[in-house]
Protein backbone atom coordinates (compact mmCIF):
# COMPACT_ATOMS: atom_id res chain seq x y z
CA UNK A 1 0.00 0.00 0.00
CA UNK A 2 1.14 3.54 -0.81
CA UNK A 3 0.39 6.18 1.82
CA UNK A 4 -0.37 9.64 0.40
CA UNK A 5 0.29 12.07 3.23
CA UNK A 6 -2.58 14.44 3.98
CA UNK A 7 -1.30 17.54 5.77
CA UNK A 8 -3.87 20.02 4.41
CA UNK A 9 -1.48 21.21 1.70
CA UNK A 10 -1.66 18.40 -0.81
CA UNK A 11 -2.93 18.12 -4.34
CA UNK A 12 -4.57 14.92 -3.19
CA UNK A 13 -7.21 14.45 -5.88
CA UNK A 14 -4.85 14.55 -8.85
CA UNK A 15 -2.30 12.29 -7.16
CA UNK A 16 -4.95 9.76 -6.16
CA UNK A 17 -6.35 9.82 -9.70
CA UNK A 18 -2.90 8.91 -10.98
CA UNK A 19 -2.71 6.04 -8.50
CA UNK A 20 -6.10 4.85 -9.74
CA UNK A 21 -4.88 4.87 -13.35
CA UNK A 22 -1.81 2.89 -12.29
CA UNK A 23 -4.01 0.43 -10.39
CA UNK A 24 -2.02 1.02 -7.21
CA UNK A 25 -3.30 0.35 -3.72
CA UNK A 26 -3.14 3.59 -1.73
CA UNK A 27 -4.53 5.40 1.29
CA UNK A 28 -4.79 9.16 1.91
CA UNK A 29 -3.85 9.61 5.54
CA UNK A 30 -2.11 11.50 8.32
CA UNK A 31 -2.16 8.57 10.77
CA UNK A 32 1.11 7.07 11.97
CA UNK A 33 -0.34 3.57 11.92
CA UNK A 34 -1.09 3.88 8.21
CA UNK A 35 2.39 5.22 7.49
CA UNK A 36 3.95 2.35 9.44
CA UNK A 37 1.88 -0.11 7.42
CA UNK A 38 2.67 1.47 4.04
CA UNK A 39 5.25 0.13 1.60
CA UNK A 40 6.03 3.58 0.20
CA UNK A 41 5.09 7.21 0.83
CA UNK A 42 3.98 9.99 -1.52
CA UNK A 43 4.33 13.46 -0.01
CA UNK A 44 2.45 15.87 -2.32
CA UNK A 45 1.83 19.53 -1.73
CA UNK A 46 0.82 22.95 -2.96
CA UNK A 47 0.70 26.17 -0.99
CA UNK A 48 2.80 27.92 1.65
CA UNK A 49 5.65 26.29 3.57
CA UNK A 50 4.88 27.84 6.97
CA UNK A 51 1.37 26.39 7.54
CA UNK A 52 2.50 23.16 5.89
CA UNK A 53 5.32 22.71 8.42
CA UNK A 54 2.99 23.71 11.26
CA UNK A 55 0.58 20.95 10.25
CA UNK A 56 3.35 18.36 9.92
CA UNK A 57 4.64 19.19 13.40
CA UNK A 58 1.14 19.20 14.91
CA UNK A 59 0.58 15.63 13.70
CA UNK A 60 4.13 14.46 14.51
CA UNK A 61 4.69 13.70 10.85
CA UNK A 62 7.92 15.70 10.70
CA UNK A 63 9.84 13.40 13.04
CA UNK A 64 8.33 10.30 11.43
CA UNK A 65 9.44 11.40 7.98
CA UNK A 66 12.93 12.33 9.16
CA UNK A 67 13.48 8.81 10.48
CA UNK A 68 11.67 6.61 7.96
CA UNK A 69 13.55 4.16 5.76
CA UNK A 70 10.60 3.63 3.43
CA UNK A 71 10.82 4.97 -0.15
CA UNK A 72 9.37 8.49 -0.11
CA UNK A 73 8.55 10.74 -3.06
CA UNK A 74 7.99 14.45 -2.44
CA UNK A 75 6.06 16.39 -5.10
CA UNK A 76 6.33 20.19 -5.57
CA UNK A 77 5.94 21.67 -2.06
CA UNK A 78 6.52 18.15 -0.75
CA UNK A 79 9.97 18.14 -2.33
CA UNK A 80 10.72 21.66 -1.09
CA UNK A 81 9.95 20.71 2.50
CA UNK A 82 12.60 17.98 2.36
CA UNK A 83 15.29 20.68 2.38
CA UNK A 84 16.81 22.44 5.41
CA UNK A 85 14.99 25.75 5.12
CA UNK A 86 13.15 28.14 2.85
CA UNK A 87 13.04 31.91 2.49
CA UNK A 88 9.25 31.51 2.31
CA UNK A 89 8.35 32.72 5.80
CA UNK A 90 11.25 32.18 6.34
CA UNK A 91 11.06 28.82 8.08
CA UNK A 92 13.11 25.74 8.81
CA UNK A 93 11.91 22.64 7.03
CA UNK A 94 12.63 18.91 7.41
CA UNK A 95 16.40 18.98 6.88
CA UNK A 96 16.58 15.73 4.93
CA UNK A 97 18.26 17.36 1.92
CA UNK A 98 20.92 20.08 2.26
CA UNK A 99 20.11 23.54 0.97
CA UNK A 100 17.76 26.49 1.27
CA UNK A 101 14.86 27.36 -1.02
CA UNK A 102 14.96 30.79 -2.66
CA UNK A 103 12.27 32.71 -4.53
CA UNK A 104 12.57 33.40 -8.24
CA UNK A 105 13.43 37.03 -9.00
CA UNK A 106 10.27 38.67 -10.34
CA UNK A 107 12.38 41.37 -11.99
CA UNK A 108 13.92 38.74 -14.28
CA UNK A 109 10.92 36.55 -15.14
CA UNK A 110 7.27 35.97 -14.33
CA UNK A 111 6.63 34.44 -10.93
CA UNK A 112 5.41 31.80 -10.38
CA UNK A 113 7.20 29.62 -12.88
CA UNK A 114 4.21 27.98 -14.54
CA UNK A 115 3.99 25.62 -17.49
CA UNK A 116 5.95 22.93 -19.30
CA UNK A 117 9.72 22.88 -18.95
CA UNK A 118 12.48 20.54 -20.06
CA UNK A 119 14.17 18.45 -17.40
CA UNK A 120 17.85 17.66 -18.01
CA UNK A 121 19.51 14.73 -16.25
CA UNK A 122 22.77 15.37 -14.42
CA UNK A 123 25.87 13.55 -15.65
CA UNK A 124 26.11 10.18 -13.93
CA UNK A 125 22.44 10.13 -12.89
CA UNK A 126 21.07 8.63 -16.12
CA UNK A 127 20.34 5.24 -14.52
CA UNK A 128 18.40 6.53 -11.51
CA UNK A 129 15.30 4.32 -11.09
CA UNK A 130 12.89 7.28 -11.30
CA UNK A 131 14.10 7.97 -14.86
CA UNK A 132 13.54 4.52 -16.35
CA UNK A 133 11.92 4.77 -19.82
CA UNK A 134 11.91 8.59 -19.67
CA UNK A 135 13.90 10.05 -22.60
CA UNK A 136 16.42 12.87 -22.07
CA UNK A 137 14.93 16.33 -22.42
CA UNK A 138 11.40 15.30 -21.45
CA UNK A 139 9.00 18.11 -20.53
CA UNK A 140 7.15 18.16 -17.20
CA UNK A 141 4.55 20.58 -15.81
CA UNK A 142 5.78 23.09 -13.20
CA UNK A 143 3.96 25.54 -10.90
CA UNK A 144 6.18 27.10 -8.24
CA UNK A 145 7.62 30.38 -6.98
CA UNK A 146 10.50 28.94 -4.94
CA UNK A 147 13.32 26.73 -6.15
CA UNK A 148 15.88 24.35 -4.67
CA UNK A 149 19.60 24.73 -5.36
CA UNK A 150 21.60 22.37 -7.53
CA UNK A 151 23.64 20.16 -5.16
CA UNK A 152 25.29 16.76 -5.09
CA UNK A 153 21.85 15.25 -4.50
CA UNK A 154 20.40 16.72 -7.70
CA UNK A 155 19.36 14.05 -10.22
CA UNK A 156 18.02 16.45 -12.85
CA UNK A 157 17.68 20.18 -13.40
CA UNK A 158 15.35 22.57 -15.19
CA UNK A 159 16.11 26.15 -16.16
CA UNK A 160 14.04 29.27 -15.53
CA UNK A 161 16.41 32.20 -15.89
CA UNK A 162 18.94 29.91 -14.15
CA UNK A 163 19.20 26.17 -13.40
CA UNK A 164 17.40 24.76 -10.38
CA UNK A 165 16.87 21.29 -8.96
CA UNK A 166 14.00 19.48 -10.69
CA UNK A 167 14.63 15.99 -9.26
CA UNK A 168 16.54 15.23 -6.06
CA UNK A 169 17.41 12.00 -4.29
CA UNK A 170 19.17 10.98 -1.11
CA UNK A 171 19.02 7.41 0.18
CA UNK A 172 15.31 6.46 0.30
CA UNK A 173 14.14 10.06 -0.21
CA UNK A 174 13.24 11.41 -3.66
CA UNK A 175 11.65 14.65 -4.74
CA UNK A 176 10.36 16.23 -7.93
CA UNK A 177 9.71 19.96 -8.24
CA UNK A 178 7.23 19.48 -11.07
CA UNK A 179 3.84 17.76 -10.95
CA UNK A 180 4.10 14.25 -12.45
CA UNK A 181 0.38 13.75 -11.88
CA UNK A 182 -0.24 16.66 -14.31
CA UNK A 183 2.51 15.79 -16.79
CA UNK A 184 0.80 13.30 -19.06
CA UNK A 185 2.45 10.03 -20.06
CA UNK A 186 5.91 11.09 -18.89
CA UNK A 187 4.63 11.94 -15.44
CA UNK A 188 2.70 8.70 -15.26
CA UNK A 189 5.87 6.82 -16.19
CA UNK A 190 7.76 8.51 -13.37
CA UNK A 191 5.07 7.53 -10.87
CA UNK A 192 5.12 4.00 -12.27
CA UNK A 193 8.88 3.96 -11.75
CA UNK A 194 8.40 5.00 -8.14
CA UNK A 195 5.92 2.18 -7.60
CA UNK A 196 8.33 -0.29 -9.20
CA UNK A 197 11.08 0.99 -6.92
CA UNK A 198 8.83 0.50 -3.88
CA UNK A 199 7.82 -3.01 -4.87
CA UNK A 200 11.06 -4.11 -6.53
CA UNK A 201 9.37 -4.44 -9.91
CA UNK A 202 7.13 -7.17 -8.46
CA UNK A 203 3.77 -5.45 -8.20
CA UNK A 204 0.67 -7.61 -8.10
CA UNK A 205 -1.22 -5.41 -10.57
CA UNK A 206 -0.37 -4.55 -14.15
CA UNK A 207 -0.25 -1.08 -15.66
Description of each model-found segment:
Residues 47-116:
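Cysteine-nucleophile active-site neighborhood
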Residues 18-25, 49-54, 118-120:
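Short, flexible loop segments at the rims of nucleotide/cofactor-binding pockets, characterized by
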Residues 42-44:
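Structural motif
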Amino acid sequence: MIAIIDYKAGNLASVSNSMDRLMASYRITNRMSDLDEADGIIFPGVGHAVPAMRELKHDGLDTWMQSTRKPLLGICLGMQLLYESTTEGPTETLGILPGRLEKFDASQQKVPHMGWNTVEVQLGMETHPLLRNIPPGTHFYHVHSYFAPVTGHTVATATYSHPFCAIAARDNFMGVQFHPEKSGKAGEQLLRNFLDLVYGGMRTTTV
